[in-house]
């Protein structure tokens, strides 16, 4: 086909040009004969019939399983942080994203900044379906979803996973949970 006729065909919108077609690759007679000879041999036929097509261990194929990044069967890591300002909180979020448990000791922070930090990390923990727990006064535990957190404190009925209640629980009577240094212990649920 000449160059001019090709250009005319392209401009006219002809999708199929004379020389352009898809060739299907068919097996040659020699290949078909080899396959038939293989099947006719009783030893090969039994081996083929008894083979498991899903047995990946005996096949000479390489495994195509790819591990999840950040997930390992080795020991888990715990990151202990004692931030002095809110600017250090993205490091805690990054540790949670890397599936590390984070313990925050907020005694060195200003009370307003500490409350903001807890809210920020709690939001990040919620976003990754993680768990959060108050460990002590101004000390909090944040864990990714791959970590089970249980509590064996005497005020709970039985050890269980971390509660994920959304509403704050305040009591006017005896306090059973530790209060943060900046908290007001005389809060009511409706004030």
Curated annotation (Swiss-Prot):
Function noted in UniProt: Cell division protein that is part of the divisome complex and is recruited early to the Z-ring. Probably stimulates Z-ring formation, perhaps through the cross-linking of FtsZ protofilaments. Its function overlaps with FtsA.
Residues forming coiled coils: none
Name of the featured protein: Cell division protein SepF
Quaternary structure and interacting proteins, as annotated: Homodimer. Interacts with FtsZ.
Biased composition (Low complexity): 151-164
InterPro entries the UniProt entry points to: Cell_div_SepF (IPR023052), Cell_div_SepF/SepF-rel (IPR007561), SepF-like_sf (IPR038594)
Keywords: Cell cycle, Cell division, Cytoplasm, Septation
Similarity comment text for this entry: Belongs to the SepF family.
GO cellular component: cytoplasm
Organism whose genome encodes this protein: Prochlorococcus marinus (strain MIT 9301)
Segments of this protein annotated with the region Disordered: 151-191
Bias (Polar residues) ranges: 165-178
GO biological process: division septum assembly; FtsZ-dependent cytokinesis
